[in-house]
């Protein structure tokens, strides 16, 4: 029964692992719901800033903020939002594939690249892959704060204002639904014009201080809020991916336990049959 003992030990080990993955799945569900709430709460802020920027720009067409001016692209910047932990399926791998593909297009056109990396997995990836990482931050926790991101974002904004980069994009996972997380590369600055029905209406605003100074401040806040939104949404996507990965692991463990249990029963039956045969054979010899 040596083989049966090994199988029994393996079954016990897999059951122990199954309990862990099942618990991690439940924790991921709880964290995902909280992340979804933070995601929903932060979205209106960024959208309202975008609307006010549009009103200000329309009301003051003579002033063009640097973040609204297109220029020849010689160097680009990426804010790469990854997770701090693994066990979330192919979430980070798919994100890095999308980023590398976009970077390859820029390099083919002779465009140089600077990187701002959010998350430990992104930092580890670029240590191996290579890349000019000019800013990095990690271990933001389950409830990231926009204040934690301001320093790293400022590095990229200053680079844009100084002319060291000509375009800035954010790379993150979009939370489509519980089963779908989509890696995306979105341009932050120069600001991409989007059709907004509200801008067609007349808004009688009084700006204090003047509209130019207000626009300068709002532009920075807008970029910061977009990066924060990407971090919060990526966190929700991470928890959803981890929930799915742990559920699959739990289900696979159950299948493996069933297969091993069948093998164990067959081995035990064979051992019992052999013992009976030996007893019968011994009795016949007597």
Swiss-Prot record:
SUPFAM superfamilies tied to this protein: ATP synthase (F1-ATPase), gamma subunit
Q: Name one GO molecular function term.
A: proton-transporting ATP synthase activity, rotational mechanism
Q: Which Gene3D superfamilies match?
A: 3.40.1380.10, ATP synthase, gamma subunit, helix hairpin domain
This protein's UniProt keywords: ATP synthesis, Cell inner membrane, Cell membrane, CF(1), Hydrogen ion transport, Ion transport, Membrane, Transport
Predominant location category: membrane
One Pfam family named in its UniProt record: ATP-synt
Question: What is its membrane topology?
Answer: Peripheral membrane protein
Looking at the keywords, is Transport present? Answer: yes
Kindly list the cysteine pairs connected by disulfide bridges: none
Q: Name one GO biological process term.
A: proton motive force-driven plasma membrane ATP synthesis
Q: Which CDD domains match?
A: F1-ATPase_gamma
What subcellular compartments does it reside in?
Cell inner membrane
| InterPro entries, per the entry | ATP_synth_F1_ATPase_gsu, ATP_synth_F1_gsu, ATP_synth_F1_gsu_CS
Keyword check for Ion transport: yes
A single GO cellular-component term on record: plasma membrane
Instruction: Relate the assembly described in the record.
Output: F-type ATPases have 2 components, CF(1) - the catalytic core - and CF(0) - the membrane proton channel. CF(1) has five subunits: alpha(3), beta(3), gamma(1), delta(1), epsilon(1). CF(0) has three main subunits: a, b and c.
The protein's job, in short, is: Produces ATP from ADP in the presence of a proton gradient across the membrane. The gamma chain is believed to be important in regulating ATPase activity and the flow of protons through the CF(0) complex.
PANTHER family for the chain: ATP SYNTHASE GAMMA CHAIN, ATP SYNTHASE SUBUNIT GAMMA, MITOCHONDRIAL
Identify its protein family. Belongs to the ATPase gamma chain family.
Protein name, entry field: ATP synthase gamma chain
Organism from which the protein derives: Pseudomonas fluorescens (strain Pf0-1)
UniProt lists the gene as atpG
């Amino acid at each position: 029964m040596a083989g049966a003992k090994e199988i029994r030990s393996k079954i016990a080990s897999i059951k122990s692992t199954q309990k862990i993955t099942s618990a991690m799945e439940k924790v991921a569900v709880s964290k995902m719901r909280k992340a979804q709430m933070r995601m929903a709460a932060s979205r209106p802020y960024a959208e309202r800033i975008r609307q006010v920027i549009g009103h200000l720009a329309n009301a003051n067409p003579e002033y063009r903020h640097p973040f609204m001016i297109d220029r020849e692209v010689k160097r680009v910047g990426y804010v790469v939002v990854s997770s701090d932990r693994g066990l979330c399926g192919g979430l980070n791998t798919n994100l890095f594939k999308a980023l590398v593909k976009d970077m390859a297009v820029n390099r083919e056109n002779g465009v140089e690249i600077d990187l701002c990396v959010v998350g430990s997995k992104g930092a580890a990836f670029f240590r191996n892959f290579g890349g000019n990482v000019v800013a990095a931050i990690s271990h933001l926790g389950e409830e990231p704060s926009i204040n934690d991101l301001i320093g790293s974002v400022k590095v990229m904004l200053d680079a844009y204002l100084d002319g060291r980069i000509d375009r800035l994009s954010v790379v993150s996972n979009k939370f489509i639904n519980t089963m779908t997380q989509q890696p995306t590369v979105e341009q932050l600055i120069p600001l991409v014009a989007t059709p907004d029905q509200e801008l067609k209406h007349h808004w009688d605003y009084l700006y204090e201080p003047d509209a130019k100074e207000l626009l300068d401040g709002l532009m920075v806040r807008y970029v910061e809020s977009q990066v924060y939104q990407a971090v919060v949404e990526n966190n929700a996507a991470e928890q959803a991916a981890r929930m799915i990965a742990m559920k699959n692991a739990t289900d696979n463990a159950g299948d493996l336990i069933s297969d091993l249990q069948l093998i164990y029963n067959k081995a035990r039956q064979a051992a019992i049959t052999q013992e009976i045969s030996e007893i019968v054979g011994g009795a016949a010899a007597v």
